Amino acid sequence: MILELDCGNSLIKWRVIEGAARSVAGGLAESDDALVEQLTSQQALPVRACRLVSVRSEQETSQLVARLEQLFPVSALVASSGKQLAGVRNGYLDYQRLGLDRWLALVAAHHLAKKACLVIDLGTAVTSDLVAADGVHLGGYICPGMTLMRSQLRTHTRRIRYDDAEARRALASLQPGQATAEAVERGCLLMLRGFVREQYAMACELLGPDCEIFLTGGDAELVRDELAGARIMPDLVFVGLALACPIE
């Protein structure tokens, strides 16, 4: 069995797979301590290998790797940046500046689609990347996600105060808000959907209307109605991780 981890800005996503990437366990952790606590309950699983992708600092990643190697008898593989992987060419002028999670997601998408594709990852930040049919990464965009937009309004606007339960209820409709939570949540979601629509229009122009659309990240479901033909793949980064860090 293989332990896989995607260490993002806010959360650590993990899963244990066997065979053809069949998941036998998994979860989300808000900190290294929470992750270790979750994984401790899985120590009975015969984990023989570990691979991870991290957007954290090198020091933070090294500390996490050390803790993982104490939990399981493994030597963890850590994905690194590259100019090229699996037929995809990194489009950044300084390839090392492209976030590793973005890189693995767009590589995975092209590997699965075998044609031009648009990849939108809706997490704390929202990223969009365009990949041509020949594997050339054209570049992409970054904007705040729902969580960031919401937190910035709460932080910098004194009279905006509401809890997460109110936020969830507010998204039951997109009618004009009649309370602060409704106005903020629906306004942010409409901005997010507008961004997604614009990305699709740009992809059709640059890549052609038959390009494949991939949605991933925690808020992908919030925009799926905007792109009826999109493939929603929560584990897209893990597909790319397997390409970057193959294990026999």
From Swiss-Prot:
Keywords: Antibiotic resistance, ATP-binding, Coenzyme A biosynthesis, Cytoplasm, Kinase, Metal-binding, Nucleotide-binding, Potassium, Transferase. K(+) binds at residue 121. One of its GO terms (cellular component) is cytoplasm. ATP binds at residues 6-13, 124. Disulfide bonds: none annotated. It catalyses: (R)-pantothenate + ATP = (R)-4'-phosphopantothenate + ADP + H(+). It is found in: Cytoplasm. Its EC number is 2.7.1.33. It comes from the Bacteria. Pfam families: Pan_kinase. CDD domains: ASKHA_NBD_PanK-III (cd24015). Monovalent cations. Strong preference for ammonium over potassium. GO terms for molecular function: ATP binding; metal ion binding; pantothenate kinase activity. Pathway: Cofactor biosynthesis; coenzyme A biosynthesis; CoA from (R)-pantothenate: step 1/5. Gene3D superfamilies: 3.30.420.40. Its main location: cytoplasm. Its cofactor is K(+); NH4(+). The active site is at 101 (proton acceptor). Changing residue 121 to A: Loss of activity. Substrate binds at residues 92, 99-102, 180. InterPro entries: ATPase_NBD, Type_III_PanK. Homodimer. Belongs to the type III pantothenate kinase family. PANTHER family: TYPE III PANTOTHENATE KINASE. Catalyzes the phosphorylation of pantothenate (Pan), the first step in CoA biosynthesis. Can utilize a wide range of phosphoryl donors other than ATP, and does not discriminate between purine- and pyrimidine-based nucleotides or deoxynucleotides. Is responsible for the resistance of P.aeruginosa to the pantothenamide antibiotics, since it cannot bind and phosphorylate these pantothenate analogs. This is Type III pantothenate kinase. The lineage of its organism: Bacteria, Pseudomonadati, Pseudomonadota, Gammaproteobacteria, Pseudomonadales.
